[in-house]
Amino acid sequence: MQTMGNSGRSAHAESLTASRTIYAAREALAALFGCERADHVCFTANSTEALNIAISGLLAPGDHVLSTDLEHNSVLRPLYREKERGVSVSFLPANRQGCIDYADFDRLLQKNTRAVICTAGSNLTGNLLDLARIGAFCAAHGLLFVVDASQTAGVFPIDMCAQHISVLCFTGHKSLMGPQGTGGLCVAEGVDIRPWCVGGTGVQTFLPSQPPQYPTRLEAGTRNGHGIAGLLAAVEFIRETGMDAIRTHELALARRFYEGVRDVDGVHVYGDFSSSMRAPVVALNIRNEESSIIADALAEDYAIAVRAGAHCAPRMHKALGTVEQGAVRFSFGYYNTEEETDAAIAAVRELAEQ
């Protein structure tokens, strides 16, 4: 798209093109996530911004929140900041496989519990949380349910209504296959979020406060029209290709890699692989070698791109016992191949022999 105006700011053709494209993206994402209203799909730059909006806009001093050890700093740091305002947080602990005990939701529930705020899947281990089970718990106790779907959106089905999700936060650049700088939050009917950022909206100019209706309520300033157009194209690709086909391919590669490295002497793989339903990532270490050294060797000697270090998941690393070493994470996407996967297996085996 070579030319696009500023959505919602003018009536000329370029501006209207932007408005129509952005609304089409709202409709596509609402359909993908089971969000009842397209105008409740609010765009942000990424899931970090979306989570900040949701967490700061839903909680008040005196509230209590349930979360888990699986969380990314995009959930953790906003929650820690809310603790400074008088919000209390209880984290469901993870075991050495990175799994939680769902009975801990009942154990940690308090009279002032306001919400469960958690990831759909660990970005480190690939372990998934049972959103339907957690959503049913929230519905039974009148709690808000805020989900960080950064690791699963576009690969695993999400139905906000069926899973009782109050706010779904997503990023465009991961499994949705969209451009960097895109993301958003889908807000269920009846959920009121205080605006995190206020300013120009192009409508209701004489109001001293942010307009009350979604999506304008949470969208101050110019939207990333070109990025959202790219995200729309990506969602259309997912719909045309089929989420099941995408997931089947990615999980097959991840399983192939896991089975190829799990028994290699000196290799330690993290996460629960007893279930076939898990995010298509595999995190490992080779003996006591620093994860960054392994990642550098993979990049320089084998042209294999991985991520090493702490992965913005400090509580998960504490649970796994990898705070000092970190971990090397292999991620498998729709455009990866069996040949690339086998090359990665061979590289890990060679490095483990050194």
What do the PLM-derived regions correspond to, one by one?
Residues 1-354:
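Pyridoxal 5′-phosphate
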